[in-house]
């Protein structure tokens, strides 16, 4: 289980709440596969990891790019992450979403924002970084302070699809009432976001 304080956002008197819980790998371990060292708790069987890291010491402004090499962060999944959600911990900032499912790369900077209803946006060469932005050991970062800045700390939640457990992908709507999206299993939790148009995130369970 987990313990709560008395914040009205999670534990207000007479209020009801829902929590979705994912088990990662237990005790976090050091990961040195990227240029930025991380602490990772990874469940490679279920395709989920939690990654803690500090911004690179030479990421001092949005245009920083490590002399064109950018930065990489080890995620511990052993497979390319389809979805990565990054949040700055020590200051205000939004939750930035990218990954293979959005065809995110350093060049296009494709991303969504978890706490916003906007469509997919781009931030070329400052959000994600490097030629192999998402691969089976690391994901790449630029110098934008929302994901990588000297003196700041971050957390990333990484997901890769696993048959029978999870599926992260995109699909095209057709406006009908009988549009079946194949996942290979019966989902218990569903998160949907229209990325070509504005609108909120839809969560079903």
Regions found by a protein language model. Give the residues of each.
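Surface-exposed molecular-recognition determinants
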Residues: 1-205
């Amino acid at each position: 289980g987990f313990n709560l304080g008395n914040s009205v956002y999670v534990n207000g008197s007479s209020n009801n709440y829902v929590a979705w819980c994912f088990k990662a790998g237990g005790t976090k371990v050091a990961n040195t596969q990227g240029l930025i060292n991380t602490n990772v708790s990874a469940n490679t069987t279920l395709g989920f990891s939690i990654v803690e890291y500090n911004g690179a010491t030479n990421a001092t402004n949005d245009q920083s790019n490590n002399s064109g090499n950018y930065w990489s962060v080890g995620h511990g999944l052993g497979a390319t992450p389809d979805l990565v959600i990054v949040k700055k911990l020590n200051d205000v900032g939004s939750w930035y979403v990218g990954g293979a499912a959005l065809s995110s790369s350093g060049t296009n900077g494709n991303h969504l924002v978890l706490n916003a209803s906007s469509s997919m946006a781009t931030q070329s060469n400052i959000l994600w970084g490097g030629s192999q932005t998402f691969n089976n050991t690391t994901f790449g970062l630029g110098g934008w302070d929302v994901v990588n800045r000297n003196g700041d700390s971050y957390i990333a939640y990484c997901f890769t699809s696993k048959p029978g457990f999870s599926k992260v992908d995109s699909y095209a709507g057709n406006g009908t009432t009988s549009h079946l999206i194949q996942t290979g299993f019966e989902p218990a939790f569903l998160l949907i976001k229209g990325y070509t148009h504005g609108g909120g995130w839809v969560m079903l369970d």
